[in-house]
Amino acid sequence: MQFKSMVISNVEVSPAYFRMRMTAPPAIVEAIPGQFVMVRVRDAIDPLLRRPFGIFDLGTFPTEYTDCGRQTFCEILYKVVGKGTEMLSSLHHGDHLDILAPLGKGFAVGDPADEKILVGGGVGLAPLYYLAKELAKNSRVRLFAGGRNKEDILCITEFERLGVETYVSTDDGTLGASGLVTEVLEKHLAEDTGRKSLFACGPFPMLKAVAGIAGRHDLECQVSLEAYMACGVGACLGCVIKGKNHSDQTPDFRCVCKDGPVFFYQDLKWD
Amino acid sequence: MQFKSMVISNVEVSPAYFRMRMTAPPAIVEAIPGQFVMVRVRDAIDPLLRRPFGIFDLGTFPTEYTDCGRQTFCEILYKVVGKGTEMLSSLHHGDHLDILAPLGKGFAVGDPADEKILVGGGVGLAPLYYLAKELAKNSRVRLFAGGRNKEDILCITEFERLGVETYVSTDDGTLGASGLVTEVLEKHLAEDTGRKSLFACGPFPMLKAVAGIAGRHDLECQVSLEAYMACGVGACLGCVIKGKNHSDQTPDFRCVCKDGPVFFYQDLKWD
Amino acid sequence: MAKPDLSVEISGIKLRNPVMTASGTFGYGKEFSDYLDLEKIGAIITKGLSLRPKAGNPTPRIVETPGGMLNAIGLQNVGIDAFIGEKLPFLRTVDTPVIVNLYGNTLEEYGELAEKLDRLPEVAGLEVNISCPNVKQGGIVFGTDPNAAAEVVGLVRRSTSKPLIIKLSPNVTDVVRMADACVNAGADALSLINTLTGMAIDLQKRRPILANITGGLSGPAIKPVALRMVWQVSQAMAVPIIGIGGIMSATDALEFMLAGATAVQVGTANFLDPSAAQTIAAGIEDYLAKNGISDVKELIGALKI
Amino acid sequence: MAKPDLSVEISGIKLRNPVMTASGTFGYGKEFSDYLDLEKIGAIITKGLSLRPKAGNPTPRIVETPGGMLNAIGLQNVGIDAFIGEKLPFLRTVDTPVIVNLYGNTLEEYGELAEKLDRLPEVAGLEVNISCPNVKQGGIVFGTDPNAAAEVVGLVRRSTSKPLIIKLSPNVTDVVRMADACVNAGADALSLINTLTGMAIDLQKRRPILANITGGLSGPAIKPVALRMVWQVSQAMAVPIIGIGGIMSATDALEFMLAGATAVQVGTANFLDPSAAQTIAAGIEDYLAKNGISDVKELIGALKI
Ligand SMILES: Cc1cc2nc3c(=O)[nH]c(=O)nc-3n(C[C@H](O)[C@H](O)[C@H](O)COP(=O)(O)OP(=O)(O)OC[C@H]3O[C@@H](n4cnc5c(N)ncnc54)[C@H](O)[C@@H]3O)c2cc1C
Ligand SMILES: Cc1cc2nc3c(=O)[nH]c(=O)nc-3n(C[C@H](O)[C@H](O)[C@H](O)COP(=O)(O)OP(=O)(O)OC[C@H]3O[C@@H](n4cnc5c(N)ncnc54)[C@H](O)[C@@H]3O)c2cc1C
Ligand SMILES: Cc1cc2nc3c(=O)[nH]c(=O)nc-3n(C[C@H](O)[C@H](O)[C@H](O)COP(=O)(O)O)c2cc1C
Ligand SMILES: Cc1cc2nc3c(=O)[nH]c(=O)nc-3n(C[C@H](O)[C@H](O)[C@H](O)COP(=O)(O)O)c2cc1C
Ligand code: FES
Ligand code: FES
């Protein structure tokens, strides 16, 4: 759906990382973890295109505290990396946005008996919070959160409040274990061989490493990808990624916006 | 000069008319009435070009009430007519602007013994307030303010506080006399034949009528013009207007931005 | 006042209003059906179709530029058979003319494709892309050489009796010459413009941003060029013109009509606002009503010089 | 690290840094002297000069468009005699190379003007505008036909021994062919691009906004087209190129250099920020220092494909 939204709050949770809460119509609660929103930052041509962000959280204000009935909202967690996110970060309570949501295919929850392993790299953590909230209702959930340094480690307390066991690592060792999140994950898997499935979001090299791990350990694994997007609805073919059957002779392109952003790792070509 | 400025206040003084006060360096006090500023509304490419506005007022905060020393400021009075002014109107205290000021040639004060007749059409009133402030120090000043309807009549009390005698007229008679400001002016001049000089700012047809009146009554008369501008400093030749000697064979173009915006009416070609 | 008449006709294709969706920016219509009422727009122009499925270019395929975007999709498409099997059934359910945008890698492919499309009753007309700057095998040559263009147009003309629209490239010295060649070879109408060829560079990586190096520039940035070309062609000859390029609002659309366009296409705007085409059509109606204009056709070419 | 070397050379004109100001957007330098230090930029290119004073077009002459602007100044200028009498004296006091942009209404005028400029020691080089889209008597023909261009260039070449830069129009099918013709006829360097021809319309008045109907599109909107053309020409031949079109920042400038430009010109950006040229030059220095690049010349044509 397309809707007008009002910024409720927009808080810097770590240097250059913001968490923004905005109003959304009640139907937003049907969004599946892993789905995303496309935000039109300004009603002007600069920036021109919408910017995609994972859904970090959803909710409804309790009626006791507002006069406006049950106001639903959604949240994004974003990193300021360029013009669009810079402009977003300067918005205040009461400013307006135009939103498309929920878009794409989210995570499949899978067998509740499986332990759920979430792997987030940097701001890739964003869609994993809403996912953790859903998964934690029926399953045991662990989070492996990695970043380059301690500033990239976000909202760990929020995950812990859900009962999620968290494992933090940073490339430079400024917080948690020192090293890549995938190294920490691999170590954990070597020790704990129970049934589990993986859910990963982060930079492409990390996802590729996670897919490799899933393959070696024969685990179910879903990854959430990023791509430059224009339409967000599968029309422009700007955001495609190679599907498992892709070759120059037999093209098999998938739209990250529509067929994804979440894919089972086996469905993609990882070269 | 070029300077960064902070919005101090931005108030709607009449429907679609805003008065904005912004910080300026101390040198701004050297600006001559009739000079203008070019405002970069946003540090983005939409809108692309700066927007020109007359200087409505200048001043310095009294040191007793601030901790920041003697903060100088300038003010503009503007009408929301399109994209740039729309965006300006949404700015708040604390927002930033980039300003070029003071630009162009202002009004020549002339002989203090002359009575000063100010003629403003709509938002053309803007530069006349700062002018009236200066003129009222040494001369008798009258203001003829016209508009299409009562919403277009701005800040009359402010002029009266300076001791200016005001004559209001509207096309539809919703405030003051009914009819064109130039008709009211003409009537006044028929009755009062003392030495006087004219200072006019408003839409081109009004200025043309004022120039005609000045010619018939043989009065000194300065008009402040508008034109689409790009550079504001006489370089792009976008804002030119025909000078008195202009013909296709002997081009005589003047830059509104640099040779004006204020001209003695005889220096221009009024066809 | 009675409701203004928004209908226009392009070489026999009757449109309820002049607002169509531009090829490649609106998929096959269905992708946008959650966001607007497909029966409130003038026509749907489908993604550039080829004889066989086509993979398109490697990624990145798109990048934002100041006031516009570059794309180098490389005409990825499902091919005519899948189009008939998978896309047409939905389009058949929508009561809005469907115009198929097509291209060939060779002269023969253009003809063969046009023949196949000619047999489909759901297809209201053909829009032939001779202007796509991304495919080296043909597009660029047909679109910038009047003789080559005339050859394609002539062949397609002989292969179909459906209304034939030729989509022109702006990357030419003299668009009127191209227009003239196409009309003489049998085009019923002209769409202009396609994208301007452009490039974007990543300073830090020292690489072109698009995998294809260059791409097609679309969006508001190109509107002045598009308006100029529509006006030039409309001044030079009497052929129905479909104006395209940076149309974001009803005002933009009406400017193209004043310049001589009978209808318009909305492209990049669909990405900013998936309901753009409907909003623009409604805005045109509003404008006519507010200004006491009873028929949008009064505005076609009504520019005063 | 030592201060990076920003100097470049265009056919013998030594520039302290690669940032020049584009003709027509910077007057005769003096207009901007309150806003920047004219001795901190690479070169000043003066407003298009003709043999006799020229009135230019009626107004409106400029209008903002999405991400850009149209201008139809019509080459209003003071003429060579007033240039020598009124403008050169100031420029003589500035220790920065002055390149004179010139145009003629006829072939002969180009030659005569070049001869006169050849005699002025203050003039470091000539930039010949064969691409202005606003003057019907000549500009447009010379700029879009390779033979006509070669003729002008050849004549000017014989009329001056100063460095000869030819400024190309983007309104052509094949910019490389134009570039080739100019270089073969004796051009030392090429400036590209001039403005794209465009148009803007006032819906309510049903009139073109510019009195001249069409005008030249400049600003960020055209940057992708400019980058593409610089890259195409730099791939095709070994001639110093000056990149122009929508440069607003040091990043933009460096992208043009990666694409093959030896230097750049800043045009429309001067209107947004009268100190733009100096800011961009300083930004280039910063970039080099931060990235450990000792010489800006390393970046020329360093794009990896
Ligand atoms: C499905 C999806 C979900 C996303 N979820 C989040 C999220 O929850 N939080 C978050 O902070 N970011 C998220 N992103 C990335 C986010 O969309 C980009 O960071 C944002 O669009 C950058 O906009 P900008 O204008 O600030 O940067 P720009 O100025 O456009 O570009 C700055 C740099 O950011 C990178 N970039 C730009 N656009 C994208 C893009 N679409 N995908 C990947 N990289 C890009 C490029 O490397 C570019 O050099 C998501 C992207 C996708 C596709
Ligand atoms: C020297 C000078 C002093 C001015 N002083 C004032 C002032 O004190 N207060 C005030 O409200 N306005 C003033 N103006 C006019 C003001 O600059 C324009 O109203 C403003 O630039 C419009 O910007 P916009 O983006 O809102 O409108 P746009 O969206 O750019 O255009 C909307 C409409 O406004 C008109 N317009 C746009 N730019 C100009 C312009 N430069 N000159 C005249 N008309 C224009 C056009 O008719 C256009 O159709 C002055 C103009 C000049 C040249
Ligand atoms: C992502 C994208 C894909 C496109 N694909 C096609 C295509 O397949 N065939 C075609 O003729 N034009 C194609 N175009 C060009 C558009 O139809 C249109 O001519 C151009 O984008 C200019 O219009 P706009 O500025 O409104 O986008 C495409 C444009 C974009 C942005
Ligand atoms: C107002 C204006 C006047 C111009 N006059 C000239 C001129 O006299 N001669 C010329 O060769 N180019 C002229 N140009 C073109 C610029 O030099 C430059 O090539 C073009 O604007 C593209 O650069 P930009 O996008 O940085 O502005 C003019 C451009 C503008 C905007
Ligand atoms: S963003 Fe358009 S198809 Fe995915
Ligand atoms: S605005 Fe550029 S010369 Fe006046």
Curated annotation (Swiss-Prot), chains C, D:
Its cofactor is FMN. Its EC number is 1.3.1.14. InterPro entries: Aldolase_TIM, DHO_dehydrogenase, DHOD_1B, Dihydroorotate_DH_1, Dihydroorotate_DH_1_2, Dihydroorotate_DH_cat, Dihydroorotate_DH_CS, Dihydroorotate_DH_I. FMN binds at S23, K47, G48, N101, N129, K167, I193, G219, G245, G246, G267, T268. It catalyses: (S)-dihydroorotate + NAD(+) = orotate + NADH + H(+). It is an enzyme of class 1 (oxidoreductase). One of its GO terms (cellular component) is cytoplasm. The active site is at C132. Binds 1 FMN per subunit. The keyword Flavoprotein applies. Pathway: Pyrimidine metabolism; UMP biosynthesis via de novo pathway; orotate from (S)-dihydroorotate (NAD(+) route): step 1/1. Transmembrane segments: none annotated. Its main location: cytoplasm. One of its GO terms (molecular function) is dihydroorotate dehydrogenase (NAD+) activity. GO terms for biological process: 'de novo' pyrimidine nucleobase biosynthetic process; 'de novo' UMP biosynthetic process. Keywords: Cytoplasm, Flavoprotein, FMN, NAD, Oxidoreductase, Pyrimidine biosynthesis. It holds the Pfam family DHO_dh. It is found in: Cytoplasm. Substrate binds at K47, N71, A72, I73, G74, L75, N129, N194, T195. Belongs to the dihydroorotate dehydrogenase family. Type 1 subfamily. NCBIfam families: PRK07259.1, pyrD_sub1_fam. Heterotetramer of 2 PyrK and 2 PyrD type B subunits. Catalyzes the conversion of dihydroorotate to orotate with NAD(+) as electron acceptor. This is Dihydroorotate dehydrogenase B (NAD(+)), catalytic subunit. The gene is pyrD.
